[in-house]
Amino acid sequence: MDTRENAPEIIREFLIYHETIKGHSEKTVDEYYLDLRTFFRYIKIARGLVPRDAEFETITIQDVDLELVKSVTLTDIYDFLNFLSRSRPNAQGHTGLSAASRARKIATLRSFYKYLTAKAKKLEVNPVADLDSPKIRKSLPRYLSLDESRALLASVDGRHRTRDYCILTLFLNCGLRISELVDLN
């Protein structure tokens, strides 16, 4: 199995920096690794470093070195984003990642190249410095109608009916988020 422990040194240093210095969670750092692995797998295919018909998920990035990282251009990153929007399967099994997923991968690349230029001082040029993030549509919150609210309150029963009814009333009348409601004592 390809884990971040198998990452090339240049990526491993970046991941360690984020986990130890920046204090990011292990899960966040694992996601950074997966984003970088996807990116460098794509770069290896695009540069002809592996056969075009190679199974994407089996391409190793252990041989990625500073020279390959330095050679990445803004055009390479645009091509990668195009690949993500047209070729990669998404969570629903369809083709093409959402703008939000692509934006997260861009954030990883920005962080990686910023680390290499500003912190590690291994690069002089940051190819993602001028990269824009894809526009993400924000969905508006969906509110319950008056009838739906009444039906919800009417459905409360059980041993803790009074408590649950009060919690729901507070939730509905104050417009609390679930996380805010859970934090109440």
Regions found by a protein language model. Give the residues of each.
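Conserved catalytic core of the tyrosine transesterase superfamily
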Residues: 1-185
